[in-house]
Design a protein with these regions (language model features):
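Conserved beta-strand positions in the central sheet of alpha/beta enzyme cores
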Residues: 48-51, 78, 100-102, 126
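Short, acidic/polar
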Residues: 27-40, 84-91
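Conserved anion-binding
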Residues: 12-24, 93, 97-139
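Catalytic domains of carbohydrate-active enzymes, especially glycoside hydrolases
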Residues: 35-50, 95
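Alpha-helix-loop-beta-strand connector modules within alpha/beta enzyme cores
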Residues: 9-12, 57-80, 111-130
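Catalytic cores of alpha/beta
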Residues: 70-100
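Glycine-rich, proline-tolerant flexible connector loops at the mouths of alpha/beta enzymes
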Residues: 46-64, 104
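Generic structural signal for hydrophobic
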Residues: 39-42, 69, 92, 116
Length: 139
């Protein structure tokens, strides 16, 4: 039987953790560095940070958060959001991420998987799927 793993996924927007419903109406839920300490002390198996911000300033904040979190983290750290090229992957790995999550860009350019695999190894790639269910009622 496979071991069950606890892998919290933290959404970050403008450097803060957020929670939303159906990819909107986000509310602030706290500081990511504090949360990393808590999950580390509770022996989570891995932690995932996803940057859902769309601007360059937030991308730099996210890199800094990954850097700080990796120093406090006692488990593998996975980071993603806004990754569109090898340079983005390199920055995250250099900042302390063990793996990267490719989501939206994967549907636009599947070759990025092979590029990452060649440069960093297949062990550091996670494919993510954003799924939004729209219920259509028949009248």
């Amino acid at each position: 039987m496979l071991k069950k793993r606890v892998i919290p996924v933290l959404l970050l927007k403008n450097g803060r953790m957020v929670k939303g419903k159906k990819f909107k109406d986000f509310i602030d839920t706290g500081d990511p560095n504090t949360t990393v300490k808590i999950y580390s002390s509770q022996d989570a198996d891995e932690i995932v940070f996803l940057n859902i911000s769309k601007n360059e300033i937030s991308k730099k904040k996210f890199i800094n958060i990954i850097n700080e979190a990796s120093k406090k983290c006692s488990m593998p750290l996975t980071a993603g959001g806004g990754i569109t090229n090898l340079e983005d992957v390199k920055e995250l790995i250099k900042s302390g991420a063990d793996k990267v999550v490719i989501t939206t860009h994967l549907t636009q350019d599947f070759s990025i998987i092979n590029d990452i695999k060649k440069k960093f190894g297949s062990q550091c790639i996670v494919a993510g799927v954003d799924y939004l269910f729209n219920k259509i009622k028949n009248k």
